[in-house]
């Protein structure tokens, strides 16, 4: 038999048998520990970027007196995520199941898809990272995918299609260059840092519960 014919037959056999091979488990499933490691790396990258950018912006543009007045004013320091039901204490967090913590994390991530675009100039001018809003958006999308995969593993394996939050943060004027705009950008960075901290914390708890020897890392 000619080489080309043998190759064609082998390809046809492989395509015919592919569904059976999948059902029989011939393709190894990615370990849960690896999925959690990947999600944690992505969450930590976002949290670190949010924290460092917030701190850099604060040191460069926000006088101490403005910082304190901002943080003490509930109207300026209120984040959109406050409307998302999240655990308010360590005890409440521990009472949530792994799946609940993943769902909350997913909602927090999705709530930043549009708002992060309002910080394009801040990210572009950062001396620490020099990333664009599209880069941060891709980081968020990567983590969203990782969390969704974890949720599928913890459920019945069927994909979830939840509603994506499209908060616009309309109170932030990206075209303004005055001091008020600086405070608004500062507020947005404050909320981004706060929410990414929550996501990393929730994922760390899920990892600690699920993977032996992973607590404290």
From Swiss-Prot:
What is a single molecular function from GO for this protein?
growth hormone receptor binding
PROSITE patterns this protein is in? Answer: SOMATOTROPIN_1, SOMATOTROPIN_2
Q: Which UniProt keywords apply?
A: Disulfide bond, Hormone, Metal-binding, Phosphoprotein, Secreted, Signal, Zinc
> Which positions does the record annotate as the modified residue Phosphoserine?
132
Q: Which Gene3D superfamilies match?
A: 1.20.1250.10
The record's family statement is: Belongs to the somatotropin/prolactin family.
Q: By what name is this protein known?
A: Somatotropin
Its ancestry begins with: Eukaryota, Metazoa, Chordata, Craniata, Vertebrata
